[in-house]
Amino acid sequence: MRDFFFDTANIEFIESTMEKYGSDIKPNWVRGVTTNPNAFSKIDKFHLDEWINHAHKMGHLISQIRGDNNGEIHIQAPFSKLDPEVILEYAKIISDVTHGLCKVGMKIPPYQNVLEYVDEFNKHVLTNVTGLADSSTALKCCTYDLNYISIIPGRMEEVGIDAESAIAFVNQCNFGKTEIITGSQRTTEQIIYSFYLDTVPTIGEKCWNDIFQGDNFKRILDIEYGYEPVGPFSPLITQDNIDLSLAFFKQMDGLGDTARKDLEARLA
């Protein structure tokens, strides 16, 4: 089994999951926690100070689970169209509050003006371009010095997009340092093929019990990482891919609006 991220901001859930399944999960398999405004909304946290305080708690928890300070918490910018300099200040705030506990991954949108700021972000945090729903945009992002890109197969498959082929194509074309995170997983099968495709999957609350049903966990442990080449041409990119990414950021921007206002007031 390779590394994974907990896809939740619910500390109590992470603690109970490790208590229940910790004997089967090696501590260093837990890469960390990934969150976004939707994850914070599910635990009724909408204000910036709540996000900052919770980031510290998550960093402390991941440090305890792993027994080191090499774990990661990934926090999304509260609004996708923030000026890159504002996102950088936000990244510094989160990095300061988690100093000595863990690394911080800043989840940023795939917009050109933000991508051009990646070198500045990298001086302070790990960089993770999120909300990707097509192979072309994903590969464009990989030309920048990013630590991660996050593809959203669960959401892609809900609208009939072949996420597995898209991820395999990106992996076979990406020769840089950028790792692929597979997020928004809906089923254990998606998690299994995400491991098979040599990505770092995120595992949300709904999937954990199912992972330990039947032979699912054994299948994950026995996976030989790799995949068959999918050919020299990118999977077809349609309006569905574009609409899905736009809908993702529209949802996150709405849920992060309170934190955005708090951040802008704090930096004014």
Language-model-derived ranges and their functions:
Residues 12-25, 89-90, 116-117, 134-144, ...:
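Catalytic cores of alpha/beta
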Residues 22-29, 94-104, 123-124, 143-148, ...:
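Structural recognition of alpha->loop->beta junctions
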Residues 32-33, 37-41, 131, 147-159, ...:
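Glycine-rich phosphate-binding active-site loops on the catalytic face of alpha/beta enzymes
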Residues 46-54, 82-86, 133, 158-166, ...:
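Alpha-helix N-cap and loop-to-helix initiation/capping positions
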Residues 98, 109-118, 122-179, 185-190:
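Conserved anion-binding
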Residues 177-268:
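C-terminal alpha-helical cap/extension of soluble enzyme domains
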